[in-house]
Amino acid sequence: MEKITLAELKERQQISSLDEYTDMDLSHEEDYNRFKDIFPKSVEAIEKLPTDKIYVNTEDLQGDDFAFYRYGSLRAWAYQALEWAFTDDYDEEAEPDNWQTVNVYRLFAGFKEEAVINTINEYWQIEIAELEV
């Protein structure tokens, strides 16, 4: 897992303060209520993820600012991944041979801590790093 200091983040993304970013943890209740019926297994696993470290997007490998200007805990990024999965019509019960959709729960290995950021970075081609505070 890559780490980045606030000074490095400010230099890379030309910000003066983390206040210029959206704190994704502020929408936890909304995220929980939105996805608890759509992705119940995923939400149950996500709720067990830690919230004690901050993660930020440091690079978009698609040449865009797809997930810039936001930060959050591992739990918040997992909910962001559910948002992307929902937008892309992923399913939580899809079988491996179903070529029409992706099983989001399986994609994230049951939302185990070590899989969340690595899967987001690989699957959505961005780079999320832990912010050193």
Task: Label every model-predicted segment.
Residues L18-I126:
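Acidic, low-complexity, intrinsically disordered interaction modules
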Residues E130-V133:
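Short acidic DE-rich linear segments
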Residues E2-T22:
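Extreme N-terminal leader/activation tails
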